[in-house]
From Swiss-Prot:
Any one of the GO CC terms: small ribosomal subunit
Subunit record text: Part of the 30S ribosomal subunit. Contacts protein S5. The interaction surface between S4 and S5 is involved in control of translational fidelity.
Name the record gives this protein: Small ribosomal subunit protein uS4
Source species, domain of life: Bacteria
Region annotation (Disordered) ranges: 22-45
Keyword Ribonucleoprotein appears in the UniProt entry: yes
InterPro entries registered for this protein in UniProt: Ribosomal_uS4 (IPR022801), Ribosomal_uS4_bac-type (IPR005709), Ribosomal_uS4_N (IPR001912), S4_RNA-bd (IPR002942), S4_RNA-bd_sf (IPR036986)
One GO process term, biological-process aspect: ribosomal small subunit biogenesis
Molecular function GO terms recorded: rRNA binding; structural constituent of ribosome
Source organism of this protein record: Chlamydia trachomatis serovar D (strain ATCC VR-885 / DSM 19411 / UW-3/Cx)
Amino acid sequence: MARYCGPKNRIARRFGANIFGRGRNPLLRKPNPPGQHGMQRKKKSDYGLQLEEKQKLKACYGMILEKQLVKAYKEVVNKQGNVAQMFLEKFECRLDNIVYRLGFAKTIFAAQQLVSHGHVLVNGKKVDRRSFFVRPGMQISLKEKSKRLAIVTESLENKDQSSLPAYLSLDKAAFKGELVVAPELDQIASQLPLPVNVSVICEFLSHRT
């Protein structure tokens, strides 16, 4: 499935949340879902609900691809432990998302650009693959020149240290952060801009693999 390239505000309106963390909340101007002029939303079938939860998760992590969902599920489904937690961890610990959570970028899309353009270092080495899986103990920092980028400095200045997830540490002065421990399911859920039923998504994917 191709990457979504349409208006991001349309996605936010569809789910009724400022899902991408933008300064201007698109719901203030148009609170209704696209194509609707009232607040009534149609009741969905079980299959429709599964699709919606899947689309919500994709949006929460910067419009990730269908094949990335399937790949993540295949990697965890036969492992011991909480499948839903391990599945969600695959996306929460993506490099672009960690960069976003640390406050190096105001939005997940800006974080994706920082990674793709080679501004981000992992344990001192450049990594430009946004889907790179960050493991506990890995340090995330920026190149010296990149520390002076306006999008970085402005974002860090506005970063509330108290909003930093417990599984991350941040040294603002050094432009450096670390994934301290693997995040728990409830910790990840608290960081998402809207509730996502991960179990429903895993059930849907179980019929696709």
